[in-house]
Amino acid sequence: MDLELKNRVALVVGGKGYIGTAVADRLRAEGATVVVASRSAGDSPDSVAIDTADQASVDAGIARVLEQHGRIDALVVTAAPSAGTLDPARKSDPDQVLTAIDGKALGFLRVANAVLPAQRAAGFGRVVVVSGQNAYLSGNITASLRNTAVSVIAKNLADEAAGTGVTVNVVNPGTVTDTPSPEVRPGGPGDSSPQQIADLVAFLASPLSVVSGESISIAHRVLGQITI
C-alpha cells in the first residue's frame, strides 16, 4: 500500500534511538525526506540538533528544518529517557516523577508547540508520539505518570487542531524487543519490535490516516484489563 509519503518532509525527534532509527528507516522507505533530530546533530545534512529539555534548542532546531525544507509534514517524537534510567526505589519520589514528566511529556509538548503553527498554516500535518503501556499500569508512579501525561497532552493538542487538517496521536508499545514473543503474561502487555512500531507510526504519519486524538496500543494491550 502506497502511504503517499513520497517527498513529504518528516522530522523524527529521537531518530538515532532504538525505535527512532526504525521509524526513520521506514519513512525513508516510503519516499519521505527524513530529518533526524537528536541532541548532537553530527555532520549529516539530514540531521538537526534538538534537546527537547531546552526550549531555545527546540525553537532553533525547528526553525532550521523549516528554513531548509519549507515545511514539516510529519512530526514523530520518540525521544525520552529510557525506562531503564528510572530508579525503582524512587518510583514515588516527587523529584524523580517531575524529572520524568519533563523529560518525556513536556519534551514532546515543547516540540509539538514549535511545529504545530506551521502545520496549521499549511492546512496539513501529522504528529505522532511514542509513549508506552505503563500508562495503563499501576505500581510505579513515575512510569505511569510520565506516559499518562503524554496521552493527556496529545489529546488536548488533537482537539485544539480539530478541523485544521492536523492530526495528533500516541502509539503505546509494551515490551520492545528485536525478537517479540507471541506470548502475553496476565497483567502485562505484549511484545513488539521497533519495525512493527515503525509500521504503525508510518501509517499515522501519512495522508491516508485521518485518526486523531487516539492513544493506540501496539501488540497486545495489557492482558486482563479493560479501559474505556
Task: Give residue ranges: language-model regions.
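Rossmann-fold cofactor-recognition segment
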Residues: 44-56
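Conserved glycine-rich cofactor-binding loop
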Residues: 16
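Active-site loop of short-chain dehydrogenase/reductase
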Residues: 8, 70-74, 119-132, 163-166, ...
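A glycine-rich helix->loop->beta "capping" turn
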Residues: 64-77, 83-85, 167, 210
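Catalytic loop of short-chain dehydrogenase/reductase
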Residues: 81-82, 94-96, 100, 105, ...
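Active-site Tyr-X3-Lys motif and surrounding loop/helix of classical short-chain dehydrogenase/reductase
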Residues: 60-67, 87-91, 95-103
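C-terminal helical subdomain
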Residues: 163-166, 170, 186-226
